[in-house]
């Protein structure tokens, strides 16, 4: 992906400031790798519930190995499973924790796929 962005920058004169990468879970960290490996600072990266296992637990990975605020001019992160399968600590310029960052959503008291579907929670 980094090589493709470099190609776009050289062949089409796309400004790196205009590039916005969005990634979910492991994809959020992949977006961070891309931001770390391109020759110029990307404009924005959005991390949607960056993966926690192997990145924050059992120990915190170095910033070169995960999404962090140095990967783009602006990094925003939305934490919706913070502390379980998603990163708990803030790692962007702006970190949002809707409903406290937990997977438990209002109106959905029991966490099971069957309940979530029957209660129209997804």
Question: What are these regions, as identified by a protein language model?
Answer:
Residues 1-122:
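Serine-dependent carboxylesterase/thioesterase catalytic core
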């Amino acid at each position: 992906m980094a090589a493709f962005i470099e190609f776009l920058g050289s062949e089409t004169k796309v400004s790196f400031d205009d590039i916005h990468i969005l990634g979910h879970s492991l994809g959020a960290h992949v977006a961070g790798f891309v931001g770390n490996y391109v020759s110029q600072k990307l404009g924005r990266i959005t991390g949607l519930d960056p993966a926690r296992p192997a990145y924050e637990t059992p120990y915190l990975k170095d910033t070169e190995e995960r999404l962090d605020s140095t990967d783009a001019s602006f990094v925003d992160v939305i934490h919706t499973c913070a502390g379980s399968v998603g990163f708990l600590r803030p790692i962007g310029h702006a970190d949002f924790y809707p409903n406290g960052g937990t997977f438990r959503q209002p109106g959905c008291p029991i966490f099971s796929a069957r309940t979530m579907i029957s209660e129209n929670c997804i």
